[in-house]
Curated annotation (Swiss-Prot):
The protein's name in its UniProt record: Polyribonucleotide nucleotidyltransferase
UniProt key word Iron-sulfur: no
Keyword Cell inner membrane among UniProt keywords: no
Top-level enzyme category: transferase
GO CC term, one of those recorded: cytosol
NCBIfam families on file: polynuc_phos (TIGR03591), PRK11824.1 (NF008805)
Organism encoding this protein: Geotalea uraniireducens (strain Rf4) (Geobacter uraniireducens)
Reactions catalysed, as given in the entry: RNA(n+1) + phosphate = RNA(n) + a ribonucleoside 5'-diphosphate
Lineage, broadest ranks: Bacteria, Pseudomonadati, Thermodesulfobacteriota, Desulfuromonadia, Geobacterales
Length: 696
């Protein structure tokens, strides 16, 4: 039976419908707003795989080309691998729902969001977040929802829920908030150096805004939902647990306080191996349970030590930042480079400058666009002492790269002031927590090293949370183990003036305004400390670009002269680039960017363009080339493609019988413009130029 609910949201109507499409899925809904429609399905297997010890949740998001009235490009003419935007949207859907499944529910679960129609003003990604929760709510899959997502913008000091594309152009905040009825679960986005207080207001504006969407899902579930599956509590072998505790607990307590990551992990691995060996005979076939108990003890001991003693794994208190070392200009041929090391996390970052030809072309549902700032994050397995087969960037690498990119994009110079394409590459060489924020710090330093005039340096920090009941501790600059064993990963990046990007993920049911406010305040303290350490190496952007970077010079020509620069079939512009080796980019306003690493070549290209677009001025001297001799005078080219007539009477002060007595084709001659008629014909005089010299 078809069931539909509607809710007014941000001045628009959102409809959630079930029972019409994909009825064999465990749960399926169509969420629509305006002309945007997303089909979201949820399916879980009936049983978990034998020996399964983790929750295998998969989220897929796909934008069908037909949703925007397009046919896919390429040879096969069908949707191919996910775009970066689709990958990022998968992560947006996944992260808020993942912590809301029962801990012991281990069945394969798949969420599929398919965009079947799209307009520019209703974000299909946001509707997909709502749809994923709604599909789970009406299904038999155990899920502790609902949740909903909203995009928050701010224009002229006024917060807006799900702003339009035009409103986002004017907004100084762009964040996505996902939340349940009582708490915020996920936050991600960027801002234009906005204060922590304003960011907190934006987040909880979003939380308040989604309440009608939660109520709509509850209504849909009451009308069309089915009974949830029973998830039996996990069976605990108390005898085995007691034996594991007797053997390993005291040693584990010492091991989790070893400061070095490698030594700590080696010690824990040794405890695990010895415990397994000691219990192999009495508890044969129980290796997974033994490892699970050891993991539980590690979790318990680390958290207890932090909450009771205020001391973390590596001996720091909750606010102390790890030791930071920085270096710039270490890659001789890179346009800018930095090595940022914080504790056992290290990022090598390079900045490269290019021209408009290097811009990334992005094909979306709404046409093609260009992107001039790119940040690519790479996480090789050696950074954590592992091996793996690599087939290109994974979802995590794309997500971390985009977070760092957003953090730095807010301080870039305007394109008119700095017309370069900028690519930042962060290669993580070591990782023990907060590698994406190390990429922000290293990226900022590499851009300053490259001479990119950014507004201000940017630093990033990852905050953590340990929460047991009403007790909690906020951790600054978390380790990888603190991320794994903690309840929150809250990354905040910004300048000394304000936040430029943030991302929060949690493993519990939500965090309160109090916790988030403390985390943001503590993050500011840490960020200012990190900015200070960065300033010890480089404070502002270098005044000059690298000698290996292209120099871009901008000139302007009249719009009716653009065709003269390009020439028939591109003949003129091709001739200039071949003669000089420069790169030339012309837009339809007459703006011309000329890029070259050779100043002399750039100057020559500018002269050639000026010659092609120059216009004769009455009374001005020109060095011309005789192109054709006639009985009545000679045609002299004063600019490429621009000729004027020197009448026989204007050849000399004396009477001239034959033009060839004075000029021959191919001669260079100094002439003066003595007039331009209504048809644009140029009158030149050799006689008026006799004795004169061209100005330098």
């Amino acid at each position: 039976m078809e069931t539909k609910v509607q809710v007014e949201f941000g001045g628009r109507t959102i409809t959630i419908e079930t029972g019409k499409m994909a009825k064999q899925a465990s749960g399926a809904v169509v969420v629509s707003s305006g002309d945007t429609m997303v089909l979201v399905t949820a399916v879980a297997t009936k049983t978990a795989k034998e020996g399964q010890d983790f929750f295998p949740l998969t989220v897929n998001y796909q934008e069908k080309a037909y949703a925007g009235g397009k046919i896919p490009g390429g040879f096969f003419k069908r949707e191919a691998r996910p775009s970066d935007n689709e990958t990022l949207t998968c992560r947006l859907i996944d992260r808020p729902i993942r912590p809301l499944f029962p801990e012991n529910f281990l069945n394969d679960t798949q969420i599929m969001a398919t965009v079947v129609s799209a307009d520019k003003d209703n974000d299909p990604g946001i509707l997909s977040m709502v749809g994923a929760s709604a599909a789970l709510m009406v299904s038999d899959i155990p899920f502790q929802g609902p949740i909903a997502g909203v995009k928050v913008g701010r224009v002229d000091g006024r917060f807006i829920a799900n702003p339009t594309a035009d409103e986002m152009e004017k907004s100084d905040i762009e964040i996505v908030v996902a939340a349940s009825k009582d708490a915020v679960i996920m936050v991600e986005g960027s801002a234009a150096e906005v204060s922590e207080e304003d960011m907190l207001e934006a987040i909880f504006f979003g939380h308040a805004a989604i309440q009608p969407l939660l109520a709509a899902q509850e209504e849909l579930c009451s009308k069309a939902g089915v009974a949830k599956r029973e998830v039996p509590p996990p069976a605990v072998n108390e005898e085995l647990k007691a034996n594991v505790k007797d053997i390993a607990y005291a040693r584990m307590k010492e091991a989790v306080r070893i400061k070095s990551k490698v030594e700590r992990h080696n010690s824990i691995d040794a405890i695990s191996a010895e415990t397994l060996a000691a219990l192999a005979t009495e508890f044969e076939g129980c290796d997974k349970q033994i490892k699970a108990f050891l993991g539980d003890f590690e979790y318990e001991l680390v958290r207890e030590h932090i909450l009771k003693d205020g001391e973390r794994i590596d001996g720091r208190d909750t606010k102390t930042i790890r030791q930071i070392t920085t270096e710039v200009s270490l890659l001789p041929r890179a346009h800018g480079s930095a090595l940022f090391t914080r504790g056992e996390t290290q990022s090598l970052v390079a900045a490269t400058l290019g021209t408009s030809i290097d811009e990334q072309r992005i094909d979306s549902l709404f046409g093609e666009s260009k992107k001039r700032f790119l940040l690519h994050y790479n996480f090789p397995p050696f950074s954590v002492g592992e091996t793996s087969f690599r087939l290109g960037p994974g979802r995590r690498e794309i997500g971390h790269g985009m977070l760092a990119e957003r953090a730095l994009a807010r301080v870039l110079p305007k394109h008119d002031d700095f017309p370069y394409t900028i690519r930042i590459v962060s290669d993580i060489l070591e990782s023990n927590g907060s590698s994406s924020m190390a990429s922000v710090c290293g990226g900022s330093m590499s851009m300053m090293d490259a001479g990119i005039p950014i507004k201000a340096p940017v630093a990033g920090i990852a905050m953590g949370l340990i929460k047991e009941g009403e007790d909690f501790a906020i951790l600054s600059d978390i380790l990888g183990d603190e991320d794994h064993l903690g309840d929150m990963d809250f990354k905040v990046a910004g300048t000394a003036e304000g936040v430029t990007a943030l991302q929060m993920d949690i493993k519990i049911g939500g965090v309160t305004r109090e916790i988030m406010g403390i985390a943001l305040k503590q993050a500011l303290e840490g960020r200012l400390h990190i900015l200070g350490r960065m300033a010890d190496t480089i404070k502002t952007s270098k005044s000059d670009l690298s000698t290996y970077a292209p120099r871009i010079t901008t000139i302007y020509v009249k719009t009716d002269k653009i065709r003269d620069v390009i020439g028939s079939g591109g003949k003129n512009i091709r001739g200039i680039t071949e003669a000089t080796g420069v790169t030339i980019d012309i837009d339809d306003t007459g703006k011309i960017n000329i890029a070259s690493t050779d100043k002399a070549a750039c100057d020559l290209a500018i002269k050639m363009i000026r010659d092609l677009t120059a216009e004769a001025e009455e009374g001005k001297l020109y060095m011309g080339l005789v192109k054709k001799v006639m009985e009545f005078g000679a045609f002299v080219e004063i600019f490429p493609g621009t000729d004027g007539l020197v009448h026989i009477s204007e050849l000399d002060t004396e009477r001239v019988k034959n033009v060839t007595d004075i000029l021959k084709e191919g001669d260079k001659v100094l002439v003066k413009c003595i007039g331009i008629d209504k048809q644009g014909k140029i009158k030149l005089s050799r006689k008026e130029a006799l004795g004169a010299t061209l100005p330098e």
